[in-house]
């Protein structure tokens, strides 16, 4: 099948993994991003589309034309800010092509609600709350689609785990953009006397001095991310506050890598996990700190839980699983 993807080409992005998985499954993939139609840095281009309506129309009209030239059997869009006219033009010119949207982010990231203004054939999103809202209130053809892991990227390091933990020498790792809510939680853990390493982007608008010394000044991806997470005793994964009944992509990636994580409790985790969720989740920051201190002294239990989760997630929660599910729901598989 010939499939077009409209979205980012960055390594370790959702679109990267969709592209990789569809190719792995034997499909032909045409992948187009904004940078393919205009050579302006993403940040400047993004704000230009916000400020100048004609520019926004122009960019996405060019993208629509490129997709139409390819005449794919299926178009997968992921950006939340794709102009509705782009989708309309593709569907007008490709009558037999299905055009869908996959939204992997928390429900606070709908931009100007372009997704709702566009006539996609189907919508896929990860939170049952917004799935119900889209189906029941707007009568949109919406399906539940959790996040996933890429087995060719998110996989365990082939090293002795105890030796790697000694080399990495990190009790608790937190990674990603250090938003204020995440920084405040990190502060609480650090103030309790726990050795925390922070990887990713610090919050330069509202920095917290007490966590500055814990930053490693490194953004981790790929093999390096797998090495750091697998070699850390505990990965603390605090979900965005807008994850109403969903899990972030880190939840799946960490389990795919085989690292041991503690994360926020959500009822939906019971659907994903091979392990009793009470063992690795918390409902308060005090409970998180208590469990961190407990598991730091339980290496064999940590390794047992994470190994079981890793095997389960590689069997049930890969992007290949998700792509097959999508194609089945669209009657294309």
Segments and roles (model prediction):
Residues 64, 68, 72, 88-89, ...:
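Catalytic alpha-helical scaffold of carbohydrate-active enzymes acting on polysaccharides/glycoconjugates
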Residues 278-285, 294-300:
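Conserved acidic donor-binding segment of nucleotide-sugar-dependent glycosyltransferases
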Residues 296-330:
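A charged, aromatic-enriched C-terminal amphipathic alpha-helix characteristic of glycosyltransferases
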Residues 1-48, 58-62, 70, 78-85, ...:
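Nucleotide-sugar donor-binding catalytic core of glycosyltransferases
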Residues 91-106:
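Active-site proximal beta-strand in glycosyltransferases
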